[in-house]
Amino acid sequence: WTWDPVAKAWYWHRFFSHQPDLNYDNPAVLEAVFKTMRFWLDMGVDGFRLDAIPYLIERDGTSNENLRETHTVIKAIRARIEANYPGRLLLAEANMWPEDVREYFGDDDECHMAYHFPLMPRMYMAIAQEDRFPITDILRQTPEIPAHCQWAIFLRNHDELTLEMVTDRERDYLWNYYAADRRARINLGIRRRLAPLMERDRRRVELLNSLLLSMPGTPTLYYGDEIGMGDNIYLGDRDGVRTPMQWSIDRNGGFSRADPASLVLPPIMDPLYGYLSVNVETQAGDPHSLLNWTRRMLAVRKQSQAFGRGTLKMLS
């Protein structure tokens, strides 16, 4: 709870104090949320990521997680979108085991997609151990989902590489392997981008992306990873992996013409990962670049619905 001196009242927040929880039991609040969604949908956005969706509703005497009433709200949002904006998408962010996340698809009447969090660290584990078991084991634990729903699979995103869904022993192994520099560790994860995690080893970057693009589900690429962008470990919290996209060698990496001091975060300028060395414009003109390799892999994937939509059989 945090005191608001303007309202002269306390308010509840599950996470940061600048993220107050809304009272979805109040119909006026839900209508205000619908109004905000309509604004962005009318602007042309393709969908919404429902952040930390398991904690939407609060009830006294509970952990306020995965409550039945949360699913009621999601169904209402889905119905409103389907009726007025067909073809738009709801993506659930629920950092839980696959069998628990399954509930957020409903009967094809809640979220269209959901992140598969436990798969992500196990791809890194498989590469480090040169063993397929971490991947095959979690895929065996992944339940069937409605025909028109899909898992969103990923290697990195705007947060830390979360190790919440592994054992303490596995977490220590991954920390020691990928984050020997303790500055890279945050919460229960690692605050590095893909290329630094792979120590700029192009073959390992390609191997991980090949795994991602051939898994059941829809691959979700984090901006900049397609060109091997680095991070800024000296920035606080998770900001090190949220630096401006590096489009060219122009000012601020082509991201903005503004005074660099006015940017929310500074562009990367070091010799290895800075925008003078790593950018879209340069790689677009190089047929052997990571960007063009990624484009070719995506083209191959799109040629067959077996990738992502096909069935998967484990070979012993």
Where on the chain are the PLM-derived regions?
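Active-site and adjacent substrate-binding regions of carbohydrate-active enzymes
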Residues: W1-S316
